[in-house]
């Protein structure tokens, strides 16, 4: 079988829009300071990566 284009991509849009979060809408908030609760959670996640 030939390669098929991914079903979840929307033709005509930027290719990156189909590849996970952090593209487009969410990008504006990328450099907002974290709340103390988020910072704590971030530390825990870092260890597991």
From Swiss-Prot:
Protein name: Small, acid-soluble spore protein O
Keywords per UniProt: Sporulation
Regions of compositional bias (Polar residues) in chain numbering: 8-20
InterPro entries: SASP_SspO
One Pfam family hit: SspO
GO CC, any one term: endospore-forming forespore
Residues spanning the membrane: none
Region described as Disordered: 1-49
Domain of life from the UniProt record: Bacteria
An annotated GO BP: sporulation resulting in formation of a cellular spore
Organism: Bacillus cereus (strain B4264)
Protein family per UniProt: Belongs to the SspO family.
Induction per the UniProt record: Expressed only in the forespore compartment of sporulating cells.
Keyword Nucleotide-binding: no
